[in-house]
């Protein structure tokens, strides 16, 4: 009750009077409610977001924000409402950082450490606590870090505008954070003390950001920062941290599938080596580093041994997905098959459909199935084994949800596996398309629009001349396309125009003018697009008629030349005959 009264009367005198008591009682109360454990070192017993939320609650009450009541009430929410990260919940009522302040802080990243630290303190004072502070505490910087991460896309745009290095700004922020972490331990003589759960959470947040930027070297340095201070964080059943293990597998065991070089059979030319492509090369949501090497294979086997024994690790979708990719990148497909059989009871040997199987880990998801498909294709250069295991998953786990990323990867891999010399009509890719339609129809769902999926199917349609496939694609995605166009998705709009023009061109070339009119009426989507398509159609019809006219005239010309040549030969024959 006294905490609520304090929030209602936020005078500075009352705040200073109760600061010490508030910290002590708040921590004690949070422990009683189960929000904070008795020890912050054994962080694996409770979820990391619990510690982050506890720190955020105390920090928010101390800085006297109006939205602190929402944070306190969040403790009593049900588990279903607390599925997101603690920082995301805390940001729900937060104040976004204005553009002017962001520009100032980004510009300061080129200064020395002291000036950058002062700029960060200014940012905290302007956005969180107006009371000036000479030195920003680690808790304050942790809170500020979460705010900056939620606005990372805006920060990236500002960096482009002022010609600042976005990645350098974040690494400077990490350097300041690491300095405060070590300084905190020096002050209380805890140099050998491990990082607590909130510090590990913050470090992993920055690793995730650098992986998205394709700055794997900087991500490696932050990972080393965690491992040097918490050497048992990967292999200890008690202290294992899932996010750190996932990032270790991604950075040091090859579990970043978008970076893998995949052979593309569809572009292979006779006498030339197969072209190697990367799955994430066309994805604008991430940047790819120019090099990617996996290093630590021994630790991978130890992590796998731990993961297959610990229930909390088996229930992590992210961990199992990255573990599968690591085995795929290492080429250990036999170990991968045994892991799949151990966790989900799925084997390359077909089970009878009436057999009831039980999974030991998390329920199979789209992310896990993508990892399985990519891993087997990476080693086999063929989809046969991956698709056979996929069929078993769909049969024995009917509730598995296949999202847009799954279908994107399936079409990418089927396109790469397609050999035009052996399959001119790309029946393997078309079969995957029908599989996708059947799955969505069985679930009574509409397929979600994905640019890369549309692009892969467009390439197949154009290479094979299979315009009925293009019409079928537009028909299936029509509701999603209309919704996406309303949101001004430029890339999707451009690929749709390519579909339309390619189909109109094929129909006009085949003389199916009534079908062209029906197509434009059905898939014009709006008045402007319909007008543009009619103009394009009229131009194609004019070019076709001109081409046909030239063809007829050329045929007449050739016939005339042939007749003239025949007459000359006949005259020559008559002359020679008379001489004889």
UniProtKB/Swiss-Prot annotation:
Keyword Transit peptide listed: yes
Principal cellular location given in the protein's record: mitochondrion
Key words, A-Z: Mitochondrion, RNA-binding, Transit peptide, Translation regulation
UniProt-annotated location(s): Mitochondrion
GO biological process: one example: regulation of translation
Transit peptide (residue range): 1-40
GO CC annotations on file: mitochondrion
Coiled-coil boundaries: none
GO molecular function annotations of the record: RNA binding
InterPro entries: ATPase_expression_mit
Any further remark recorded for this protein: Present with 2680 molecules/cell in log phase SD medium.
Chain's role: Required for translation of the mitochondrial OLI1 transcript coding for the mitochondrial ATP synthase subunit 9.
Similarity comment text for this entry: Belongs to the AEP2 family.
Subunit composition and interactions: Binds to the 5'UTR of the OLI1 mRNA.
Identification of the protein by name: ATPase expression protein 2, mitochondrial
């Amino acid at each position: 009750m006294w905490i609520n009264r304090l929030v209602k009367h936020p005078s500075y005198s009352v705040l200073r009077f109760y600061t010490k008591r508030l910290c002590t009682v708040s921590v004690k109360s949070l422990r009683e409610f189960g929000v904070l454990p008795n020890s912050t070192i054994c962080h694996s017993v409770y979820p990391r977001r619990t510690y982050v939320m506890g720190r955020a609650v105390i920090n928010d009450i101390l800085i006297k924000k109006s939205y602190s009541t929402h944070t306190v009430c969040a403790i009593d929410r049900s588990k279903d409402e607390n599925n997101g990260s603690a920082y995301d919940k805390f940001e729900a009522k937060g104040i976004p950082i204005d553009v002017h302040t962001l520009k100032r802080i980004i510009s300061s990243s080129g200064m020395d450490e002291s000036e950058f630290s002062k700029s960060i303190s200014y940012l905290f004072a302007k956005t969180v606590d107006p009371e000036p502070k000479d030195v920003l505490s680690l808790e304050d910087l942790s809170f500020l870090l979460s705010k900056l991460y939620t606005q990372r896309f805006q920060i990236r745009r500002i960096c482009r505008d002022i010609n600042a290095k976005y990645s350098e700004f974040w690494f400077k922020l990490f350097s300041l954070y690491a300095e405060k972490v070590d300084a905190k331990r020096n002050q209380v003589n805890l140099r050998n003390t491990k990082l607590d759960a909130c510090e590990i959470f913050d470090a992993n947040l920055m690793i995730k950001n650098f992986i998205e930027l394709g700055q794997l070297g900087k991500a490696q340095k932050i990972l080393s920062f965690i491992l040097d201070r918490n050497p048992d964080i990967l292999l200890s059943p008690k202290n294992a941290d899932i996010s750190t293990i996932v990032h270790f597998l991604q950075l040091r065991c090859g579990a970043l599938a978008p970076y893998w070089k995949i052979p593309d059979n569809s572009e292979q030319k006779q006498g030339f080596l197969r072209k190697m492509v990367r799955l994430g090369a066309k994805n604008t949501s991430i940047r790819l580093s120019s090099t990617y090497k996996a290093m630590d294979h021994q630790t991978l086997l130890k992590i796998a041994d731990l993961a297959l024994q610990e229930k909390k690790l088996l229930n992590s979708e992210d961990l199992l997905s990255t573990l599968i990719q690591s085995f795929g990148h290492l080429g250990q497909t036999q170990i991968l098959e045994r892991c799949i059989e151990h966790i989900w009871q799925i084997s390359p040997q077909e089970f009878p459909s009436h057999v009831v199987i039980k999974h030991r880990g998390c329920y199979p998801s789209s992310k896990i199935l993508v990892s399985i498909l990519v891993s087997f294709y990476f080693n086999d250069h063929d989809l046969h084994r991956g698709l056979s295991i996929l069929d078993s998953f769909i049969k024995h786990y009917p509730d598995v949800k296949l999202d847009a990323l799954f279908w994107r990867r399936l079409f990418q891999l089927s396109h790469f596996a397609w050999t035009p010399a052996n399959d001119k009509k790309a029946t393997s890719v078309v079969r995957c398309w029908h599989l996708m339609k059947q799955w969505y129809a069985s679930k009574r769902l509409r397929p979600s629009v994905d640019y890369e999926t549309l692009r892969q199917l467009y390439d197949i349609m154009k290479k094979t001349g299979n315009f009925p496939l293009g019409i079928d694609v537009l028909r299936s995605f029509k509701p999603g396309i209309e919704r996406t166009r309303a949101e001004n998705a430029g890339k999707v709009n451009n690929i749709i125009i390519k579909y339309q023009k390619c189909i109109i061109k094929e129909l006009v070339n085949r003389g199916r003018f009534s079908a062209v009119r029906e197509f434009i009426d059905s898939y014009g989507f709006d008045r402007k697009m319909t007008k543009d398509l009619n103009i394009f159609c009229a131009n194609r019809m004019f070019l076709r008629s001109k081409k046909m006219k030239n063809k007829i005239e050329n045929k007449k010309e050739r016939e005339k030349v042939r007749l003239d040549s025949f007459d000359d030969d006949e005259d020559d024959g008559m002359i020679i005959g008379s001489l004889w």
